[in-house]
């Protein structure tokens, strides 16, 4: 599951990036990670508090690496596949699963994916943010099940 370089970021996220000294998606403390989850997801991701703390501590310990990766990705033109004719070459059936309330990568990305991927279909989950598999696991699983059933015949 990957956005393949198609990243029409929401005005909200671009504003947060502009107003922040660092990327809000890269936590520098366990509490930052909790804030990131709250911001990126519309529903609870169902992770217990102790696990969020542990994950946040690990992510904070790797913040410098994550910042470097973020910079490299944003500076590398090879990461921008939209409009380069790469995605239309993918003939495999593709499910585009998106949360309507995604505050990071807006739902308008779905239209771009459908244009670029000729053999795709989209499922947009209402009331779901950036992490549909964690926010709506049953709905996500059902979308995948129906997709796989349809392509298997």
Annotated model-derived regions:
Residues 83, 92, 106-115:
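Short alpha-helix in the alpha/beta-hydrolase fold that links the catalytic acid
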Residues 32-35, 56-85, 89:
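Hydrophobic, aromatic-rich cap/lid helix
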Residues 77, 101-105:
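Acidic catalytic loop of the alpha/beta-hydrolase fold
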Residues 9-14, 51, 108-109, 135-137:
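Short aromatic-enriched loop/helix-cap "lid" or pocket-rim segments at secondary-structure transitions
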Residues 119-153:
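Catalytic active-site module of serine/aspartate enzymes centered on a nucleophile-bearing elbow/loop
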Residues 90, 96-98, 102:
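Short beta-strand/loop motif that positions the catalytic acidic residue
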Residues 7, 103-104, 131-135:
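A short, basic/aromatic alpha-helical/loop segment that forms part
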């Amino acid at each position: 599951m990957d956005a393949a370089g198609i990243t029409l970021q929401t005005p909200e996220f671009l504003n947060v990036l502009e107003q922040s000294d660092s990327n809000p998606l890269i936590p520098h403390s366990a509490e930052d990670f909790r804030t990131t989850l709250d911001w990126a997801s519309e529903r609870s991701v169902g992770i217990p508090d102790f696990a969020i703390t542990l994950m946040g501590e690990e992510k904070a310990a790797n913040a410098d690496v994550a910042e470097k990766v973020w910079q490299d990705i944003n500076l590398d033109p090879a990461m921008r596949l939209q409009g380069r004719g790469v995605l239309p070459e993918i003939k495999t059936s593709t499910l585009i699963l998106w949360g309507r309330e995604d505050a990071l990568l807006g739902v308008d990305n779905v239209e771009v994916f459908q244009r670029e991927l000729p053999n795709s279909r989209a499922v947009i989950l209402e009331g779901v943010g950036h992490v549909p598999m964690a926010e709506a696991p049953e709905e996500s699983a059902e979308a995948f099940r129906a997709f796989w059933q349809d392509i298997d015949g």
